[in-house]
């Protein structure tokens, strides 16, 4: 065993030296004992955004957290080179955040996929211990067999546990239960130093809080303990249409003020026939809404609130009556409220149907120049105006989500960045501009760059004028990241110095470019 470990260490040192060399030695699969290091793949250099393509020098397919630990321990201790490491989950990033140019990509899906469930376990709560490379859809499928499910979700479930927890993880349940990072009891993390640490709010809390929403900068999540609740059997799914933005947001804020009755709240802008049709694919009932969208020079814009009420099939609660009580307080367009009952699984997995429709049309694997932002409620109307000035409603392809979140459901000890709050502004909005750009429809490289430029200008204006912050942020320079973090930068940088002082992890974010020229460690120029 000791001989094998020595051989592994020697071979890994050879790998590091080859990576630091100006020549490329990794041209064929290599087996370094327990470390399965492979040459780069197309998958490792691409993501859902299809905007950036940065090829690594090698791919690690770990069989256990110890493999990741061994790799990072060597890189952290090595005085040579500037090799970086990125953890890749489902590859759903937009701007190459999980890529590592000339570095090493860790394929998290290679980790063991066991899920352990505990009903009414420690602390009198139910939870699941799940690997960081497992997708949320897998956790849902297994937990439902026990009548349980996580409380907080993302809209799309084919994302990894570790990936969403490294950002925040939001959806229509966030107003009620907080983001996914507020529903974690414990983590197993491999730090940038190569240490395997089990952390929680009461044990190694600084690492626990750093990693949650930490953009992969402090450690790689290899296991998480996710809080569970009783799963409903059915969901009453409701949509209501509006022709006035102020009324739309007023009703959204009304709904999130009723967490006892309402379980999910989102909303979206209806710009044109295409957006109305695509948003209706997963909604399994007839929507008899045929609005006048005006003309190109004088467009008419509509809005849709989507909310849901869980149905536990309890005879003491009539879900139809609950929806009636809620809807009577709303001010939607008369006769344009629609509802349908679906299974809990189908409701949570609703985006999958839209995905399959796009795949069948050849429109899934196209460019996705998305922009996601958190906007203070006081500025949401002004943001809407900025947004409409930056797009053409008649030819916009994609979805624009707008829905409210409640600040007190977020733990500010984590690394996530929220807009600074006023004394009374406890509501903020999640806005997702989820557009597609299809080269086959004429959106060439120039077209894509123009869309990205528009988004940068919109994000910049919203940040400087409204105090908005990017979610799933992309900033091309470290200076841009400093502005993004604002007063939170010092804490973020201190955490980097503590847990990943050589700046090995998360190179695709571009927050801490690794500098091999400093003998005191790569972090010296950022502290």
Curated annotation (Swiss-Prot):
GO biological process, one term: cytokinin metabolic process
Gene Ontology CC, one term: endoplasmic reticulum
Intracellular or extracellular location(s): Endoplasmic reticulum
Every FAD-binding PCMH-type domain range: 52-231
Enzyme class: oxidoreductase
Quaternary state and interactors: Monomer.
Function, in words: Catalyzes the oxidation of cytokinins, a family of N(6)-substituted adenine derivatives, where the substituent is an isopentenyl group. Cytokinins are plant hormones essential for plant growth, development, and stress responses. Exhibits specific activities toward trans-zeatin (tZ) and isopentenyladenine (iP). Plays a role in lamina joint inclination. Regulates cell proliferation and vascular bundle number on the abaxial side of lamina joint.
Protein name: Cytokinin dehydrogenase 3
Organism: Oryza sativa subsp. japonica (Rice)
Gene name as annotated: CKX3
């Amino acid at each position: 065993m000791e001989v094998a470990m020595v051989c592994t260490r020697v071979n890994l040192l050879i790998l590091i030296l080859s990576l630091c060399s100006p020549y490329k030695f990794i041209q064929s699969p290599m087996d370094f004992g327990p470390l399965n290091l492979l040459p780069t793949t197309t998958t490792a250099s691409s993501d859902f955004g299809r905007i950036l393509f940065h090829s690594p020098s090698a791919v690690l397919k770990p069989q256990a957290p110890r493999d990741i630990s061994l790799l990072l321990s060597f890189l952290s201790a090595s005085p040579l080179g500037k090799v970086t490491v990125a953890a890749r989950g489902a590859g759903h990033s937009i701007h190459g955040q999980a890529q590592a140019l000339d570095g090493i990509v860790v394929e998290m899906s290679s980790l063991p996929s066991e899920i352990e469930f505990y009903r009414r376990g420690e602390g009198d709560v139910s939870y699941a211990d799940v690997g960081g490379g497992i997708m949320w859809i897998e956790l849902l499928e297994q937990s439902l067999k026990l009548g349980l499910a996580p409380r907080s979700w993302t809209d799309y479930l084919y994302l990894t546990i570790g990936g969403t927890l490294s950002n925040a993880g939001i959806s229509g349940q966030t107003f009620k239960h907080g983001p996914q990072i507020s529903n974690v009891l414990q983590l197993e993390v491999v730090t940038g130093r190569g240490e395997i640490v089990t952390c929680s709010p009461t044990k190694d809390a600084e690492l626990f809080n750093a990693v949650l929403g930490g953009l992969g900068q402090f450690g790689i999540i290899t296991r998480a303990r996710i809080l569970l609740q009783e799963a409903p059997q059915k969901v009453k799914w409701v949509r209501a249409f509006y022709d006035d933005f102020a009324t739309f947001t007023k009703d959204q804020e009304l709904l999130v003020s009723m967490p006892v009755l309402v379980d999910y709240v989102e909303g979206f802008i209806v710009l044109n026939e295409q957006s109305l049709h695509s948003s209706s694919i997963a909604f399994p009932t007839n929507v008899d809404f045929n609005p006048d969208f005006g003309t190109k020079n004088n467009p008419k814009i509509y809005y849709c609130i989507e909310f849901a009420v869980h149905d536990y099939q309890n005879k003491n609660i009539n879900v139809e009556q609950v929806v009636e009580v809620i809807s009577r307080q709303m001010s939607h367009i008369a006769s344009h409220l629609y509802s349908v009952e679906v299974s809990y699984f189908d409701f949570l997995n609703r985006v999958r149907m839209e995905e399959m429709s796009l795949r069948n049309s050849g429109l899934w694997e196209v460019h996705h120049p998305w922009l996601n932002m958190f906007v203070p409620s006081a500025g949401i109307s002004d943001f809407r105006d900025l947004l409409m000035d930056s797009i053409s409603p008649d030819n916009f392809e994609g979805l624009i989500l707008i829905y409210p979140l409640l600040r007190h459901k977020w733990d500010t000890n984590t690394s996530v960045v929220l807009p600074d709050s006023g004394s009374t502004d406890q509501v903020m909005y999640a806005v997702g501009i989820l557009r597609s750009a299809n080269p086959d429809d004429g959106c060439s490289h120039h077209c894509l760059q123009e869309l990205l430029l528009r988004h940068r200008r919109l994000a910049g204006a919203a940040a400087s004028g409204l105090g908005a912050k990017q979610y799933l942020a992309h900033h091309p320079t470290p200076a841009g990241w400093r502005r993004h973090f604002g007063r939170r930068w010092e804490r973020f940088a201190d955490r980097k110095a503590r847990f990943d002082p050589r700046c090995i992890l998360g190179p695709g974010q571009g927050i801490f470019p690794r500098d091999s020229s400093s003998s005191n460690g790569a972090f010296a120029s950022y502290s």
